[in-house]
Amino acid sequence: MKTIIFKDFQFEAAHYLPYVPKMHKCRRLHGHSFFVRLELKDKINEKNGWIIDYAEIKLAFQPIYDQLDHHFLNDIPGLENPTSEILAKWIWHRLKPKLSILNTIIIKETCTSGCIYQGF
């Protein structure tokens, strides 16, 4: 039986979406308090009783966080069109090699809108 654990992060960043219609509100420069949830799935280690130390998750995500927090996302290579979907995929490809049991990334731009990415 496998268990899913999660660690949440939040970062502030500005962006705009260059490929939406000119009059669309997301075409203008704006910012968000982005919410990121990393979900990891594995068997519970019988010896220590956990899947992974939460500190290891934070350590693996820290360089990505530093690249995103208080930055203009469109200037980051690979995020020229920084939709929630593309951002989730971008994070996945940087984090999965460090956290092989990464199962899901959830991105929320607002409290009502977001993306769930499972990196198949």
Swiss-Prot record:
Named cofactor requirement(s): Zn(2+)
EC number in record: 4.1.2.50
Keyword Hydrolase: no
Cofactor annotation remark: Binds 1 zinc ion per subunit.
Catalytic activity reported: 7,8-dihydroneopterin 3'-triphosphate + H2O = 6-carboxy-5,6,7,8-tetrahydropterin + triphosphate + acetaldehyde + 2 H(+)
GO BP terms, alphabetized: queuosine biosynthetic process
Coiled coil: none
UniProt cross-references to SUPFAM superfamilies, sorted A to Z: Tetrahydrobiopterin biosynthesis enzymes-like
GO terms for MF: 6-carboxytetrahydropterin synthase activity; metal ion binding
Keyword Zinc: yes
Active site: C26, H70, E109
One Pfam family of this chain: PTPS
Class of this enzyme: lyase
Binding site for Zn(2+): H15, H30, H32
Keywords, alphabetical: Lyase, Metal-binding, Queuosine biosynthesis, Zinc
Metabolic or biological pathway: Purine metabolism; 7-cyano-7-deazaguanine biosynthesis
Extra remark beyond the main annotation: The active site is at the interface between 2 subunits. The proton acceptor Cys is on one subunit, and the charge relay system is on the other subunit.
Homology family: Belongs to the PTPS family. QueD subfamily.
Role description: Catalyzes the conversion of 7,8-dihydroneopterin triphosphate (H2NTP) to 6-carboxy-5,6,7,8-tetrahydropterin (CPH4) and acetaldehyde.
Protein name per UniProt: 6-carboxy-5,6,7,8-tetrahydropterin synthase
